[in-house]
């Protein structure tokens, strides 16, 4: 069995199919792992979600910020923008089933035997594996409740949850986990999150900011960390234990697939624009 990890698809369904053809992906034998942000901006978020849902146990995804934003739009908590490119998905007959499927997806997944962890944006350097499991499980539990829109989604939008507080309770605790695992790029030297800078490290002019993965972390030493979210990196992190897979397909660049067992990246150029 092969494990394939794909970067932010964001509705680029044709490119996803093309890159899977290149490796002869067989869902009866192989697994497709996705770093989240299956939807938004690209031309066919509906087909993308339907495809991943149809794969059953052969697909393993985590939630990204755009996936959570889709829940907010569907729940009438946010309005969709033209740039979201979600109208066909929101009007689909099976939208409720697709949202329910998304709600079952976690913020982190792991392959313990490979010492591999996958999240959308990364892992806070302060966190141990036990903390990562615990905090992501709290968010997953909240998403599966009937009142998830009121109790979680309606309250998750804030830039104030930028600092890890181990004693925090309720929504404050969940907010930090969502921010860290789905939105994080840079940290200040004291460890709190910065949400403004999205440039690659070589273009960041604030001396107080460093990419999250440059801080000392027990998980960075022991595990391979697979993530997406940060298209400006274009996969360039110069560390064999970091797999940055968002390479900007929805922005006209390419989609990246990583074959775990061969430690090989396969790419597909963007074929059409939304």
From Swiss-Prot:
Gene3D superfamilies: 3.60.21.10. GO terms for cellular component: cytoplasm. It catalyses: P(1),P(4)-bis(5'-adenosyl) tetraphosphate + H2O = 2 ADP + 2 H(+). Pfam families: Metallophos. The keyword Lipoprotein does not apply. It comes from the Bacteria. The keyword Hydrolase applies. GO terms for molecular function: bis(5'-nucleosyl)-tetraphosphatase (symmetrical) activity; phosphatase activity. One of its GO terms (biological process) is RNA decapping. Keywords: Hydrolase. Its EC number is 3.6.1.41. InterPro entries: Ap4A_hydrolase, ApaH, Calcineurin-like_PHP_ApaH, Metallo-depent_PP-like. HAMAP family: ApaH. Belongs to the Ap4A hydrolase family. PANTHER family: BIS(5'-NUCLEOSYL)-TETRAPHOSPHATASE [SYMMETRICAL], METALLOPHOSPHOESTERASE. Hydrolyzes diadenosine 5',5'''-P1,P4-tetraphosphate to yield ADP. This is Bis(5'-nucleosyl)-tetraphosphatase, symmetrical. It comes from Shewanella putrefaciens (strain CN-32 / ATCC BAA-453).
């Amino acid at each position: 069995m092969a494990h394939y990890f794909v970067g932010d698809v964001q509705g680029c369904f044709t490119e996803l199919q093309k890159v899977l053809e290149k490796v002869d992906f067989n869902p009866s034998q192989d697994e497709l792992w996705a770093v989240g942000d299956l939807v938004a901006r690209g031309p066919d978020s509906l087909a993308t979600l339907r495809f991943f849902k149809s794969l059953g146990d052969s697909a393993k995804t985590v939630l990204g910020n755009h996936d959570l934003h889709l829940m907010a739009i569907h729940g009438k908590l946010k309005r969709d923008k033209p740039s979201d490119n979600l109208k066909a998905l929101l009007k689909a007959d099976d939208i409720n089933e697709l949202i329910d499927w998304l709600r079952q997806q976690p913020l982190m997944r792991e392959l313990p035997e490979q010492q591999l962890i996958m999240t959308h944006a990364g892992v806070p350097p302060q966190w141990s594996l036990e903390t990562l499991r615990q905090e992501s499980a709290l968010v997953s539990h909240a998403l599966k409740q009937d009142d998830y829109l009121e109790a979680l989604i309606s309250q998750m939008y804030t830039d104030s949850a930028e600092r890890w507080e181990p004693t925090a309770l309720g929504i404050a605790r969940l907010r930090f986990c969502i921010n860290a695992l789905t939105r994080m790029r840079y940290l200040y030297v004291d460890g709190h999150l910065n949400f403004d800078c999205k440039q690659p490290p070589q273009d960041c002019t604030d001396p107080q900011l460093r990419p999250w993965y440059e801080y000392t972390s027990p998980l960075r030493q022991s595990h391979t960390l697979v993530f997406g979210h940060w298209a400006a990196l274009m996969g360039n992190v110069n560390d064999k234990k970091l797999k940055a897979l968002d390479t900007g397909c929805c922005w006209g660049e390419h989609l990246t697939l990583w074959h775990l067992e061969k430690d090989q990246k396969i790419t597909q150029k963007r074929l059409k624009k939304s």
